[in-house]
Amino acid sequence: MTIHTDTRPTLNLIRLAHGRGLDLPAYETKGAAGMDLRAAIEDGTTLTLAPGKRALVPSGFIFEIPEGFEAQIRPRSGLAFKNGITCLNSPGTVDSDYRGEVKVLLINHGDEPFEITRGMRIAQVVIAPVTQVRVAEITEVSDTARGAGGFGSTGV
C-alpha cells in the first residue's frame, strides 16, 4: 500500500467580510502555475476602468505566505489580450511578512472602458520560493563572454 503525503507548503488565509461568498484562490487546471484571484467589490456594483486609468481592486483575503516564499501577482492573459487589462508592477510581490489585504493594481491599456464586477477573475497569484543573498562589495567582476553587453546585445 502506498501512502501519499501532501508536502506542498500551505497558504493560510483570512477571508475578510467583503470577501464572503467568493471562491477561494484556486488553480483552474491541474498544471496551472497560478491561482485565480477574484474582485471583492460590493455586490451589485460595477467598477468601470476607463482607458488609461488604473484601480486598486481588493481580493477579500489576507494571505499568510509561508516563510521563504513570496506571492507574485500577475495578469491574466485573456484579460490582457482581449481587453488590454493588465497588472502594473508585474509581477507584484507580496512578501511573506505582509499581513494586509491582497489587492490587485489593474490598468486599462485598451481603447474601451472595462467593467469589473464582483467575483470576476482579475489576476493570478503564483507562490514562489525566495532566496535572500549575502551582499558583498567588490572592486571588479569576473569576465564573461557577454561582458557588459546590455539591452539587445545578444541579438533581436
UniProtKB/Swiss-Prot annotation:
InterPro entries attached to this UniProt entry: dUTPase, dUTPase-like, dUTPase-like_sf, dUTPase_trimeric
EC number per UniProt: 3.6.1.23
Q: Tell me which domain of life the UniProt entry assigns to the organism this sequence originates from.
A: Bacteria
SUPFAM superfamilies, alphabetized: dUTPase-like
Looking at its record, which EC class is this enzyme? hydrolase
The UniProt annotation places substrate binding at R76, S77, G78, N89, T93, V94, D95, K103
Tell me the cofactors it needs: Mg(2+)
Q: A Pfam family this protein belongs to?
A: dUTPase
Q: Provide the alphabetized UniProt keywords.
A: Hydrolase, Magnesium, Metal-binding, Nucleotide metabolism
Describe which pathway this protein belongs to, using the record's wording.
Answer: Pyrimidine metabolism; dUMP biosynthesis; dUMP from dCTP (dUTP route): step 2/2
Which reactions fall under this protein's catalytic activity? dUTP + H2O = dUMP + diphosphate + H(+)
Q: Which CDD domains match?
A: trimeric_dUTPase
Q: Name one GO molecular function term.
A: magnesium ion binding
Name residues in a coiled coil. Answer: none
A single GO BP: dUTP catabolic process
Family, according to the entry, reads as follows:
Belongs to the dUTPase family.
Q: Which HAMAP family match?
A: dUTPase_bact
**Main role?**
This enzyme is involved in nucleotide metabolism: it produces dUMP, the immediate precursor of thymidine nucleotides and it decreases the intracellular concentration of dUTP so that uracil cannot be incorporated into DNA.
Q: What is this protein called?
A: Deoxyuridine 5'-triphosphate nucleotidohydrolase
Organism (species): Rhizobium rhizogenes (strain K84 / ATCC BAA-868) (Agrobacterium radiobacter)
